[in-house]
C-alpha cells in the first residue's frame, strides 16, 4: 500500500478548492462535514476517510487517482 503524503494532499485539495472558487465551509457543507475537517486536510493534520474520496474528487473536478496522487494526470487526445 502506498503512503499518502499529507502535505502534498492538503496543498492539492486547497489548490483545487480555490480554483473552483469555493470556501472550506462550502466544500465541507457539500460533503456534510465541518469546515474544521477540510481545514485539517489542507494543513496536513489528517486525510479524509475512504468513503469521502469519490464525492471529494467529484466536487474538485478530478479523479480519485489524481486526488490520491496529488496531481492531475495528462489527458490523451488520441
Language model features with spans:
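A short, Lys/Arg-rich alpha-helix, primarily the initiator
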Residues: 1-19
Amino acid at each position: 500500500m502506498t503512503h499518502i503524503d499529507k502535505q502534498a494532499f492538503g496543498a492539492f485539495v486547497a489548490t483545487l478548492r480555490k480554483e473552483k472558487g469555493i470556501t472550506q465551509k462550502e466544500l465541507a457543507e457539500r460533503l456534510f462535514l465541518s469546515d474544521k475537517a477540510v481545514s485539517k486536510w489542507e494543513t496536513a493534520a489528517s486525510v479524509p476517510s475512504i468513503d469521502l474520496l469519490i464525492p471529494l474528487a467529484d466536487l474538485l473536478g478530478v479523479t480519485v487517482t489524481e486526488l490520491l496522487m496529488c496531481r492531475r494526470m495528462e489527458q490523451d487526445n488520441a
